[in-house]
Amino acid sequence: MRFMVTNLRHVGLVVNDLDKLILFYNKLGFKVVDRKKEEGSYIEKLVKIKAVKLEWVKMKLKDNSILELLKYHSPSAKFEKKVQESNRISWSHISLTSNSIVDTIKKINQFGGNADKEYLFSPDGNVKVIYCHDPEGNILEIVEEL
């Protein structure tokens, strides 16, 4: 059998305020499908952190895309609320497709995120698009296909 990656399983995002981010992403259409606290040798070996205690929540969209939110209780992750720059070395953004960019922008702002009201049209005219931020400053790209 030939080696092959078959799909993107999920995107994991370390967060400071788990419940706030669950509410935010729920308002964008994600539904909680699983939530668990973990500690012990298995999770220590997996994440390579001694005496780790964490909690994770898996949230799913209708198309089965999964977002995993992780809260490290011990040792806690350093949190510095700042808007992430799109050109930093690391992951850049989470791109979400919406059927109404205007309504999605309203929800993002209503539930603690930050989005300008003005979106762009792609040069080919096929999509409306905007970069914005969740309540902890992570970059979201919202795309509406035309």
Residue ranges: model-predicted function:
Residues 1-22, 31-34, 91-96, 146:
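N-terminal beta-strand motif that seeds the catalytic metal site of vicinal oxygen chelate
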Residues 2-3, 35-37, 55-60, 67, ...:
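Vicinal oxygen chelate
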Residues 7, 52-53, 90, 126:
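Exposed loop/turn and edge beta-strand positions of beta-sandwich/beta-sheet ligand-binding modules
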Residues 14-64, 110:
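Core segments of cupin and vicinal oxygen chelate
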Residues 40-45, 76-82:
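A short, acidic/glycine-rich surface segment
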Residues 65, 75-76:
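Active-site/binding-pocket entry motifs
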Residues 84-88:
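Non-DNA-binding regulatory cores of transcription-related proteins
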